[in-house]
UniProtKB/Swiss-Prot annotation:
InterPro entries: Ribosomal_uL14 (IPR000218), Ribosomal_uL14_bac-type (IPR005745), Ribosomal_uL14_CS (IPR019972), Ribosomal_uL14_sf (IPR036853). PROSITE patterns: RIBOSOMAL_L14 (PS00049). It comes from the Bacteria. This is Large ribosomal subunit protein uL14. GO terms for cellular component: cytosolic large ribosomal subunit. Part of the 50S ribosomal subunit. Forms a cluster with proteins L3 and L19. In the 70S ribosome, L14 and L19 interact and together make contacts with the 16S rRNA in bridges B5 and B8. It holds the Pfam family Ribosomal_L14. It comes from Albidiferax ferrireducens (strain ATCC BAA-621 / DSM 15236 / T118). The keyword rRNA-binding applies.
Length: 122
């Protein structure tokens, strides 16, 4: 459950380490984002020779949340922290590697590239 001002770690190799959610996309009154939702983020911490710089604004898709995802069979998938993958204007991942597990809920046409790059799909 991500809202404005939430901090997330970055689960790709773009050089960003942590980001801050500045907008949840998908409606003017939308308050929370969950796994698979697109948000606007500001880079708060970045590696010196990374692809992105501190202060830049990007779109990102949420790949892990501490709140968890309830499945139709009744199971709940939770993670230790919140994580996102940075996207370009065409909603394609900027990085070429994904770190850590991602959930099966990302398996839509938009984010199949992220699922294929991920080391583990839960």
């Amino acid at each position: 459950m991500i809202q404005v001002e939430s901090r997330l770690e970055v689960a790709d190799n773009t050089g960003a380490k942590s980001v801050l959610c500045i907008k949840v996309l998908g409606g003017s009154k939308r308050r929370y984002a969950s796994v698979g939702d697109v948000i606007k983020v500001s880079i708060k911490e970045a590696a010196p020779r990374g692809r992105v710089k501190k202060g830049e604004i990007y779109s990102a898709v949420v790949v892990r949340t501490a709140k968890g995802i309830r499945r139709s069979d009744g199971s709940l998938v939770k993670f230790d922290g919140n994580a996102a993958v940075l996207l370009n204007a065409k909603l394609e991942p900027i990085g070429t590697r994904i770190f850590g597990p991602v959930t099966r809920e990302l398996r839509t046409e938009k984010f199949m590239k992220i699922v294929s790059l991920a080391p583990e799909v839960l």
